[in-house]
């Protein structure tokens, strides 16, 4: 019996019918706290990694090797005043930052950390993740409109167009995973990658979806960078034109909530990419399967997050027309064509996804 099963059994015996509700709240709280800690140290890792790429040290003053820098940043933002523009729509202005964070947290309800370790093991998990993650764009539009600033509104309109453009390609990439796995349940999608010729010979990583669905994996990940408005797709907050875009009139914790949502969404995109294309909690080789699955998932997510940061430090920002062209004229045709190719592949004698 695992530790979680032991706690669950003991709690049920102690609290009776109230235990399921208490246990659900405890799990949600634990996941939320872990995500917040991950965001704090992801920001530190980003600053450190970019510093090394620029041949400098990065944060190294607060705590040993700068490890307490995230705590100092949080305290600074908590103590700053939230200044509201006089012409802003008061309630909408305050609701927008909260509305952008809530969907980012809500997606984690269906992401499995390892076998049987998921907050809500629903059969439509992939559909839920796609739907919830799309809500964030409304918060961005709301922030741009409520600020009553032409620069904020311009940034919000850019965000809306960019997110809609890349969500279509991302959706087709996920349709490919659905076709091959035959399920919307994220745990079952991971399970579908654990069989095949290579997995049968102990080389698990060659049976994962990244290899047969490589174009879809690339499209999904790059679209994820665009969806999160990360460099080089950060025209929403283009510093040289509209400064911080929809966040230009926000300060203090209201401003920090937008950044919190951005980094949570980065982790969500990486976790979904690892789950859908990189085998989730599955070990790359069978002889390493004794290591707990959550270790492999965290390692894959960390590697993908490092790619996010590497892209930021390497590529110049695209023009807005280039971003639209990439989404509509490159990614969309590639994913549609690959859906057709995989469809014929699955109907042929060479079908590698036979259940």
UniProtKB/Swiss-Prot annotation:
Top-level taxon of origin: Bacteria
Pfam families linked to this entry: NADHdh
Entry's Gene Ontology molecular function annotations: NADH dehydrogenase activity; oxidoreductase activity, acting on NAD(P)H, quinone or similar compound as acceptor; quinone binding
Biological processes per GO annotation: aerobic respiration
GO terms under cellular component: plasma membrane
UniProt main location, coarse: membrane
Keywords: Cell inner membrane, Cell membrane, Membrane, NAD, Quinone, Translocase, Transmembrane, Transmembrane helix, Ubiquinone
Membrane topology, as annotated: Multi-pass membrane protein
Regions that span the bilayer: 25-45, 91-111, 126-146, 170-190, 205-225, 253-273, 290-310, 330-350
EC number assigned by the record: 7.1.1.-
InterPro entries membership: NADH_UbQ_OxRdtase_su1/FPO, NADH_UbQ_OxRdtase_su1_CS
Reactions listed under catalytic activity: a quinone + NADH + 5 H(+)(in) = a quinol + NAD(+) + 4 H(+)(out)
Compartment annotation: Cell inner membrane
Quaternary assembly: NDH-1 is composed of 14 different subunits. Subunits NuoA, H, J, K, L, M, N constitute the membrane sector of the complex.
Family: Belongs to the complex I subunit 1 family.
Functional note: NDH-1 shuttles electrons from NADH, via FMN and iron-sulfur (Fe-S) centers, to quinones in the respiratory chain. The immediate electron acceptor for the enzyme in this species is believed to be ubiquinone. Couples the redox reaction to proton translocation (for every two electrons transferred, four hydrogen ions are translocated across the cytoplasmic membrane), and thus conserves the redox energy in a proton gradient. This subunit may bind ubiquinone.
NCBIfam families reported in the protein's UniProt record: PRK06076.1-2 (NF004741), PRK06076.1-3 (NF004742)
HAMAP family the record matches: NDH1_NuoH (MF_01350)
Name of this protein: NADH-quinone oxidoreductase subunit H
């Amino acid at each position: 019996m695992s530790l979680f099963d032991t706690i669950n059994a003991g709690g049920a015996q102690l609290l009776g019918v109230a235990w399921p509700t208490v246990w659900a709240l405890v799990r949600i709280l634990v996941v939320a706290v872990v995500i917040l800690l991950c965001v704090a140290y992801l920001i530190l890792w980003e600053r450190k990694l970019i510093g090394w790429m620029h041949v400098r040290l990065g944060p190294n003053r607060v705590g040993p090797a700068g490890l307490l820098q995230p705590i100092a940043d949080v305290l600074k933002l908590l103590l700053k005043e939230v200044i509201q523009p006089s012409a802003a729509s008061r309630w909408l202005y305050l609701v927008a930052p909260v509305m952008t964070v809530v969907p980012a947290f809500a997606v984690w309800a269906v992401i499995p950390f390892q076998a049987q370790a998921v907050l809500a093991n629903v059969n439509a998990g992939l559909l839920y993740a796609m739907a919830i993650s799309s809500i964030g764009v409304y918060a961005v539009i709301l922030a741009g409109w409520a600020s009553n600033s032409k620069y904020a509104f311009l940034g919000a309109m850019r965000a809306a167009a960019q997110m809609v453009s890349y969500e279509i390609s991302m959706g087709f990439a996920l349709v490919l995973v659905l076709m091959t796995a035959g399920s919307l349940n994220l745990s079952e999608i991971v399970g579908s990658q654990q069989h095949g010729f290579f997995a049968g010979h102990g080389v698990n990583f060659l049976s994962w979806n990244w290899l047969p669905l490589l174009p879809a994996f690339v499209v999904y990940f790059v679209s994820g960078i665009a969806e999160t408005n990360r460099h080089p797709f950060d025209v929403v907050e283009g510093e040289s034109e509209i400064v911080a875009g929809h966040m230009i009139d926000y300060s203090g914790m209201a401003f920090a909530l937008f950044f919190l949502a951005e980094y949570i969404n980065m982790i969500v995109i990486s976790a979904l990419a690892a789950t859908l294309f990189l085998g989730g909690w599955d070990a790359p080789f069978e002889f390493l399967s004794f290591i707990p699955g959550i270790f492999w998932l965290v390692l894959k997510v960390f590697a993908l997050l490092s790619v996010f940061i590497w892209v930021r430090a390497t590529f110049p920002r695209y023009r807005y027309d280039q971003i639209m062209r990439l989404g509509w004229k490159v990614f969309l045709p590639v994913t549609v064509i690959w859906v057709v190719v995989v469809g014929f592949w699955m109907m042929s004698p060479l079908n590698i996804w036979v259940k």
